[in-house]
Regions:
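Conserved, structured C-terminal
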Residues: 1-29, 35-37, 42-45, 121-123, ...
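Acidic, proline/glycine-enriched N-terminal capping motif
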Residues: 1-105, 110-112
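N-terminal glycine-rich flavin-associated loop
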Residues: 64-78, 118-126, 166-168
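Residue-level detector of beta-strand structural context in well-folded domains
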Residues: 70, 102, 115-116, 198, ...
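Short coil/turn segments at secondary-structure boundaries
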Residues: 70, 74, 112, 128-132, ...
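Well-ordered mid-protein domain cores that form the structural environment of catalytic cofactors
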Residues: 93-123, 127-144
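A short, hydrophobic C-terminal helix/tail in secreted or cell-surface proteins
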Residues: 399-403
Length: 403
């Protein structure tokens, strides 16, 4: 029947699924989707592949299928007010043709999800959510409009299946897009600044949406086309990326790039983290009310001894460590310790393993202090140093300021 096996929990694929496989992708399940994990060359291992892919993105350009992100069309005269209520940061002054990174909180003040919203017109937005939380966010928005804010004139529609998206990232990403759009002036720095949004055409008269958004810290763009044009878009972008010795990159390389920059994902935003814990408190508006704004100020969530996002280096740079490691003081290696490691990767940029995680008191309390990572599952311990979560210098800054 429908309650067992694949009928109960179907796998979803992006419109480029077969294209990715034909170009060597090894797939992995993420939020019910099959996504490219890595693209091995010859006898490369997973580690070989993602390190090469991440290095290529930093040096030239890479293309990544991001279609699995949730996509929601928000339309109506009260759309801006609606976004201003659900996001912790301000949206009332976001201009048409700009995107903004936003963070949604639950009623209890804990982070629910993060993503970007693009203002396409005065009363129209294109929202992206994380892959894993897309259905939850969609249901949440519908619930708010149907039960709390019935006076708002807003329509929300899931368009996740209608749009196919890729990230084009790296120093040569603009050159690649220049060769792929009908009008190369569209993606110049003046016409498409950081967090800028535009609607244009790819060669072949393919309508598309482009935003200058970076998840890796490099110059990067997100490009969306109607799903029917997905493979044509991939052919066009890949043909031009190869001219700059670019690569296709998967989820593992994407993870390495984001850990180097200190960007959070579901590994960090696991349902018990506040916006302050994630080091994003400056994004919380002080000039408006929003979902979770009152509850996030509760004493238990503002405690100075809460676990705060930090970066981790092994004291011995030749050592490796794992996500799930418990962080302890040297003379008190027991129990739940003082923190935890949520994400690890080998950093091609730094040449050693790095991690993101949380520690009580945060960077201010433990900066450059040697702590111990206890990994009872693997029966190992290692010495760790607490560093800034932004482990390589940020190249671009966000305009997601308080309105």
């Amino acid at each position: 029947g429908r309650n067992v096996g694949k009928h109960f929990r179907p796998l979803r694929v992006t419109p480029m699924h077969q294209w990715n496989i034909d170009h060597g992708a090894k797939m992995i399940e993420v939020g019910l989707y099959q996504r490219p994990w890595y693209y091995p060359k010859e006898n490369e291992t997973l580690s070989d592949s993602y390190i090469r892919e991440a290095s290529t993105v930093r040096k030239t350009v890479g293309i990544c299928d991001v279609t699995s992100l949730g996509k929601i069309a928000i339309q109506g005269p009260d759309s801006t007010e609606f976004l201003n209520r659900i996001y912790s940061n301000g949206f009332s002054k976001l201009q048409v043709g700009k995107a903004r990174y936003g963070i949604m909180l639950r009623d209890d003040g804990i982070v629910m999800d993060d993503g970007t919203s693009w203002r396409l017109a005065e009363n129209e937005y294109f929202m992206t959510t994380s892959t894993g939380e897309a259905a939850k966010v969609m249901s949440w928005l519908e619930e708010l409009l149907q039960t709390r804010w019935t006076d708002l004139n807003v329509n929300v529609t899931s368009v996740s299946e209608q749009w196919a998206g890729v990230s084009v990232a790296g120093p040569k990403s603009r050159e690649v897009l220049n060769n792929c759009v009908d009008d190369s002036l569209v993606v110049t720095n003046n016409n498409l600044p950081f967090m800028g949004v535009t609607s244009t055409f790819l060669k072949g008269n393919i309508p598309c949406r482009i935003a200058r958004i970076s998840f890796s810290g490099e110059l990067a763009f997100e490009v969306y086309v109607k799903s029917d044009f997905a493979n044509t878009m991939m052919d066009l972008l890949w043909e031009n990326a190869k001219k700059y010795d670019g690569c296709l990159y998967g989820l593992e390389a994407l993870g390495a790039l984001r850990v180097e920059k200190g960007h959070v994902t579901a590994a960090e935003l696991d349902g018990r983290v506040t916006i302050d814990d994630a080091g994003l408190s400056k994004m919380a508006s002080t000039k408006k009310s929003y979902i979770g704004s009152a509850m996030r100020k509760r004493g238990v969530l503002k405690n100075n001894d809460r676990e705060i996002l930090v970066g981790f280096f092994p004291t011995n740079l030749k050592e490796t460590f794992n996500a799930g490691t418990i962080v302890c003081e040297k003379n008190n290696i027991k129990g739940q310790g003082i923190g935890r490691i949520t994400s690890v990767t080998y950093s091609p940029e730094l040449g050693h393993w790095i991690g993101l995680g949380f520690v009580k008191g945060g960077l201010d309390k433990w900066k450059d202090t040697n702590l111990v990572g206890a990994d009872p599952v693997r029966n190992k311990q290692m010495n760790l140093k607490v560093v800034s979560p932004h482990m390589i210098c940020l190249l671009y800054t966000s305009d997601a300021a308080d309105d």
